[in-house]
């Protein structure tokens, strides 16, 4: 398997200088070769078999599970993870482009080109590419936004439900706060088909552990008043080595009565507050559950802090550590309801002007669900990025081919060694459309020649589709401008950093 070559690469390399640089480029090339078949709508998946089964074509996830030990290889892993955290997409492209720049520069490095000159030229070309990318940017509207989400989904395992997921994701991001990552929650429920996935206008989470009396509690409440606590509403054992000395039965009874009085006081304070939905991150025991049921109150204990925080963020109120002062601490929404979802039960908090949204993903197996989750995460990040910057560019390798043309033209204006560096980088940018053509099953040589000719004639939106070179704007294939800018910046910076590494020193592990 290809990844084994990476894992068995020697970590301690005695070579220095140009030989070390060439060795590092070779390591990067081996890693990129493993990713190449995953690029684009017809990209293949990778299966990782270990303690858990992972099936994915997401670049960052693949690199994470490859267990790469080579230090330079780990730089590529960090590069992909950075792209994922910054803009959420382009994790495969950024590694492939970085590696191809290095591969095209490799003959120059072997011919003893000055590395400082190469680095300086890369910086100059990077700034030029960013400047031209800004000029390529197009204004975003709602129609383009849905198409942009569909473009991101096309290469994922939810592509057969592209229109449905595109609308669901765009509507969810529009409803939520763009800069609040927690305003969109994702829950994965095994069972059903991918098309059974839904977006909830509010918060939803799986029913927590319940005690006797839960069955008598209301499961649907209009305009609920929600109290969120970090309080334990049940008796608990004393701490280790705790001791209570009593002089008789009457004194022991007073201790028991005091315990009853404390928990009753807490429950009465909650009831007096007017709350009819009580959530706590700690347990709510039998007595409290039955007491609430008698007063028509729904309660749930051991709610995760993440879900409790999202309820507060969406419905208002605050998480309290005591029941003494509850006035003004209640949240509200339009509807609370507990519903059956497959073989699970879920608590829903909907409406009421909430800006939060929860996407409930369905799928036939855990591995499929995890990949759906990664696909939705990427699409959400892409839509968020586009809404934040309001600029998009065409996809399908059209941007890379146009930048390749611009860089090649720039190379003709140099009258020194920078001409060869620019030509090499221009060639490297053709790698993305070439791989798209290969993964589509097209004749790569004739397709790239055709695409190169179209761009030379001024058709800057021409990219690769299943039918060959086509106008990506007419096909509705878009990507956020920020994704391309981040990819270009990261690729140039990473390539410049790697070619300047002339030796590897293994530091001792810290004690």
From Swiss-Prot:
| Entry function | Molecular chaperone; assists the folding of proteins upon ATP hydrolysis.
- What does the similarity note say? Belongs to the TCP-1 chaperonin family.
By its UniProt entry, which CDD domains does this protein fall under? TCP1_eta
- According to the lineage, what is the superkingdom? Eukaryota
* Keywords associated with the record: ATP-binding, Chaperone, Cytoplasm, Nucleotide-binding
Quote the gene name from the UniProt entry: CCT7
Molecular functions per Gene Ontology? ATP binding; ATP hydrolysis activity; ATP-dependent protein folding chaperone; unfolded protein binding
**Gene3D superfamilies the record matches:** GroEL, GroEL-like equatorial domain, TCP-1-like chaperonin intermediate domain
Q: How does it assemble?
A: Component of the T-complex protein 1 (TCP1) complex.
The subcellular localization recorded is: Cytoplasm
Q: Check the record and name the Pfam families matching this protein.
A: Cpn60_TCP1
SUPFAM superfamilies with a match to the protein in the record: GroEL apical domain-like (SSF52029), GroEL equatorial domain-like (SSF48592), GroEL-intermediate domain like (SSF54849)
Q: What is this protein called?
A: T-complex protein 1 subunit eta
Which cellular component terms (GO) are annotated to the entry?
chaperonin-containing T-complex
> Do you know which InterPro entries this protein is assigned to?
Chap_CCT_eta, Chaperone_TCP-1, Chaperonin_TCP-1_CS, Cpn60/GroEL/TCP-1, GroEL-like_apical_dom_sf, GROEL-like_equatorial_sf, TCP-1-like_intermed_sf
């Amino acid at each position: 398997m290809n990844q084994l070559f990476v894992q068995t690469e020697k970590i301690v390399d005695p070579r220095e200088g140009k030989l070390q640089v060439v060795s590092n480029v070779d390591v990067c090339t081996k890693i990129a070769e493993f990713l190449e078949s995953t690029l684009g709508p017809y990209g293949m998946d990778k299966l990782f078999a270990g303690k858990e089964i992972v099936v994915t074509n997401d670049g960052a996830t693949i690199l994470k599970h490859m267990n790469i030990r080579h230090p330079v290889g780990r730089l590529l892993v960090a590069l992909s993870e950075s792209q994922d955290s910054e803009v959420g997409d382009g994790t495969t492209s950024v590694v492939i482009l970085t590696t191809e720049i290095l591969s095209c520069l490799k003959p120059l490095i072997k011919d003893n080109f000055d590395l400082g000159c190469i680095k300086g030229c890369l910086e100059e070309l990077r700034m030029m590419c960013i400047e031209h990318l800004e000029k390529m940017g197009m204004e975003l509207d709602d129609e383009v936004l849905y198409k942009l989400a569909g473009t991101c989904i096309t290469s994922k395992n939810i592509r057969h439900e592209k229109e449905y997921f595109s609308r669901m994701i765009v509507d969810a991001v529009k409803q939520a706060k763009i800069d609040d990552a927690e305003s969109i929650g994702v829950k994965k429920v095994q069972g059903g088909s991918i098309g059974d996935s839904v977006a909830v206008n509010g918060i939803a989470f799986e029913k927590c552990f319940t005690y006797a009396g839960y069955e008598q509690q209301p499961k649907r409440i209009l305009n609920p008043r929600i109290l969120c606590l970090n309080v334990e509403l049940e008796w608990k054992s004393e701490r280790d080595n705790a001791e209570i000395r009593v002089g008789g039965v009457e004194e022991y009874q007073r201790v028991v009565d005091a315990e009853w009085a404390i928990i009753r006081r807490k429950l009465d304070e909650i009831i007096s507050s007017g709350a009819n939905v009580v959530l706590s991150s700690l347990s709510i025991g039998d007595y409290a559950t039955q007491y609430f049921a008698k007063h028509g109150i729904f309660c749930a204990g051991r709610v995760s802090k993440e879900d409790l925080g999202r309820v507060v963020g969406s419905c208002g109120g605050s998480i309290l550590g005591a029941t003494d002062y509850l006035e003004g601490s209640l949240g509200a929404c339009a509807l609370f309801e507990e519903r059956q979802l497959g073989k699970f039960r879920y608590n829903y908090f909907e409406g009421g002007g909430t800006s939060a949204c929860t996407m409930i993903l369905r799928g036939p197996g855990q591995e499929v669900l995890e990949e759906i989750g990664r696909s939705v995460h990427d699409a959400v990040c892409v839509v968020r990025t586009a809404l934040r910057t309001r600029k998009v560019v065409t996809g399908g390798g059209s941007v890379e081919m146009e930048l390749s043309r611009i860089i090649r033209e720039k190379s003709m204006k140099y009258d020194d060694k920078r001409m060869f560096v620019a030509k090499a980088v221009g060639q490297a940018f053709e790698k993305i459309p070439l791989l798209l053509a290969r993964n589509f099953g097209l004749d790569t040589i004739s397709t790239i020649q055709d695409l190169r000719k179209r761009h030379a004639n001024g058709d800057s939106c021409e990219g690769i589709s299943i039918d060959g070179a086509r106008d990506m704007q007419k096909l509705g294939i878009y990507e956020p401008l920020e994704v391309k800018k981040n990819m270009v910046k990261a690729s140039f910076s990473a390539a410049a950093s790697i070619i300047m590494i002339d030796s590897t020193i293994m530091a001792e592990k810290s004690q």
